[in-house]
């Protein structure tokens, strides 16, 4: 027996169908991190990711100032609604107020830190003049390591989300 369902999952068509079916039990559904939208009866507990992405975009714009420059967007999983909303908010903020910033690409790490670091390193080799990295995902340490290996690290801005112990350490070290 149970009184409710608490779920933390990516937005996936099979999960949405299962949640719709679960609604017939009249038990509450609490969705952590992912808002499954109006088609699924649930309570969403989590941040407003679109606004968080907009804030990140405004910060990137302010840090890069009028000079602007090239920026890379790092995603973990495109199926994660929150991450998608963050990226949409980030892009909207850049588009509406920072025309000197050019988003040169969006890479997806699959929530794999090592892959995130490699993708950033690869982008830096193709765009040595890259000025900013926006990470909508969880792989901050490996991205910071990739940035630490290039010249002019101080010219690059790295923005991410969350204040985990790992990110607190990176923030104190000046990597974020």
Language model: regions and residue ranges:
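Local beta-strand N-terminus motif with an aromatic residue
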Residues: 2, 41, 129-130, 176
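Hydrophobic alpha-helical
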Residues: 3-23, 90, 105-166
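Flexible loop/hinge segments that line or gate small-molecule binding clefts
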Residues: 15-51, 164-172
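Hydrophobic alpha-helical segments within soluble ligand-binding/sensing domains
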Residues: 45-69, 116-117, 163-167
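Short, structured loop/turn "capping" segments at alpha-beta junctions
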Residues: 66-71, 97-105, 126, 130-131
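Extracellular/periplasmic periplasmic-binding protein-like sensory domains
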Residues: 82, 87, 94-96, 101, ...
